[in-house]
Regions:
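Extended acidic, Ser/Thr- and Pro-enriched interaction/regulatory segments
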Residues: 82-189, 193-471
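Functionally constrained cores in energy, signaling, and assembly domains
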Residues: 10, 14, 18, 55, ...
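Low-complexity RS/RG/RGG-rich segments used by eukaryotic RNA-binding proteins and nuclear co-regulators
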Residues: 67-85
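Generic detector of low-complexity/intrinsically disordered segments
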Residues: 7, 13-16, 26, 35, ...
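Structural signal for hydrophobic/aromatic residues that build the beta-strand cores
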Residues: 5-7, 23, 33-35, 47, ...
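Canonical RRM/RBD RNA-binding surface and closely related RRM-like beta-sheet modules
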Residues: 3-5, 10-58, 62, 66-71
């Protein structure tokens, strides 16, 4: 059976001693191959191989094939590799890589799920165990109740309430979306090069579900201001976002690969409503994926339920996720936590009989689906016939008709790079964001309030203008 290998520098690894020393380990199965473009942007690619000779041949073929003919510094022949000055090549690659700066993040968010959560039977969600963050959340709840009162909080969108900055994540909402798409170059390229429509649908479903486990942070991202932007490069995907509406918070986005063969685009509407002791978060809008040979898809993420603003804190995905094949009229339907205990049943028991991260689903015809525009409570019509069955756990794996397509241990996440032409409107240039990243909480709160007052003033000016110009 073939393995997938990640290699850090594209030419160095072909030196036999380096290959044996750094790659041929018994448990080493996954990795990223970074190739440097002429324009010096790192690009990550994956090669499936049987042995070293097979790997070398495939590497040369892929390095020189027509897909990349205009992209690389030079073409390679096998003879050239044998005579390569490894140390010189290592220095050259290192100098190129130094020109691209990884965007620094507070955490490796993909590791939070393993470090701070406990996944057990008989619960409706994963138990959050970070006591420091739990105390911080409790302090935020007390602050909110003191400011607004319990009755005023219930049913409100948490995104419309001015929260204290000590609850904030060191990312904007736009950065969060980009971070969740770190697997997109890998899974979308798998889908793009698949000839079978169901195979494409599988890989886009993997993209949808592989985002879940890296999104379990409990801190609140910065709400972007109208006109605020974020740009980055994720593998071969150039990604751009702009905040276009304040209420409800809406971000328009566009992403395109270097070869312009894959693009993603649309808009996302965010909302998070506070209940008695929980928070229900959802994204609606339109998220499209388009391939240059005419295939078009739409994805919808499941909702998130945070229980225990006070007391034991649980995190889980609920309702359903979707991938719609708009070209071939198929759908991939995912039902999250299918054994969830409902409100009525909770009066008699607080235990469910499966792990809360479990999901089931199926491929079906598009007209067998009841699609909900404004929430994630999509359903299958009665007597819907499954074409392919889906099962798995969002913290761990996904299977299609019993074949594993994704495992968290093998998840392919790409580095997010800064681009060299960041707009002045980039959210990371906000003063409150800058102060929070520096750890100056009081100053960050002060700057946040200044920006909020400016937004209120701008909103008043717009309202006054509309009133004045009524026909």
């Amino acid at each position: 059976m073939s393995d997938t290998l990640i290699i850090k520098n594209p030419l160095i690894f072909l030196n036999e001693s380096y290959f044996k020393k750094n790659v041929l380990k018994d448990d080493y199965k996954e990795g990223i191959l970074n190739i440097i473009y002429k324009n010096e942007i790192p690009y990550e690619i994956f090669i499936t191989f049987k042995d070293k000779n097979d790997l070398c041949e495939k590497f040369i073929k892929q390095y020189n094939n027509n897909f990349f003919e205009d992209e690389f510094d030079y073409k390679l022949e096998i003879e050239e590799i044998k005579d390569l000055d490894i140390e010189k090549e290592k220095e050259r690659v290192s100098l190129l890589e130094e020109k691209y700066v990884k965007i620094p993040y507070q955490y490796e968010y993909e590791k939070i799920i393993f470090k701070d959560y406990e996944n057990t039977l008989y619960k409706n969600g994963l138990i959050y165990k970070d006591e420091k963050e739990i105390r911080k959340i409790a302090d935020g709840a007390k602050w909110l109740i003191k400011k607004l009162g319990t009755n005023l909080i219930q049913g409100k969108s948490v995104l419309r309430i001015s929260l204290p900055v000590f609850l904030f994540d060191k990312r904007t909402l736009q950065e969060v979306l980009a971070y969740e798409l770190r697997g997109a170059p890998y899974y979308l390229n798998h889908a793009y090069y698949s000839k079978n429509p169901f195979e494409r649908l599988k890989w886009i479903t993997v993209l949808l579900m592989s985002q879940c486990y890296i999104s379990t942070f409990q801190t609140k991202p910065f709400n972007p201001i109208i006109g605020e932007t974020f740009q980055c490069k994720i593998g071969d995907l150039n990604f751009y976002l702009e905040q276009t509406v304040n209420h409800p918070i809406t971000a328009n986005f566009y992403g395109i690969t270097d070869k312009k063969n894959i693009k993603i685009y649309g808009y996302i509407i965010y909302d998070a409503t506070i209940g008695i002791n929980n928070c229900y978060a959802i994204r609606t809008g339109k998220f499209f994926i388009e391939f240059d040979y005419g295939q078009k898809y739409q994805i919808r993420t499941p909702a998130v339920l945070l229980q225990g603003i006070v007391g034991e804190r649980l995190y889980n995905y609920i309702d359903s996720g979707l991938v719609l094949d708009l070209t071939n009229n198929y759908a991939s339907y995912i039902k999250m936590n299918p054994d969830e205990i409902g409100y009525f049943k909770s009066f008699f028991t607080n235990k469910q009989n499966s792990f809360p991260d479990r999901f089931i689903g199926q491929f079906c015809k598009l007209n067998d689906l009841i699609y909900k525009e404004d929430d994630a409570k999509h359903e299958l019509k009665k007597n819907s016939t499954p074409i392919i069955k889906i099962e798995g756990a969002w913290t761990r794996d996904i299977y299609f008709d019993g074949d594993e397509y994704w495992n968290v241990d093998d998840n392919q996440l790409f580095t997010i790079y800064e681009v060299g032409y960041v707009l002045p409107s980039d959210g990371r240039k906000r003063e409150d964001y800058i102060q929070l990243v520096k750890g100056n909480i009081e100053k960050a709160q002060e700057e946040k309030e200044k920006l909020e007052n400016l937004q209120r003033y701008d909103r008043k000016l717009r309202a006054d203008y509309l009133e004045k110009n009524k026909k």
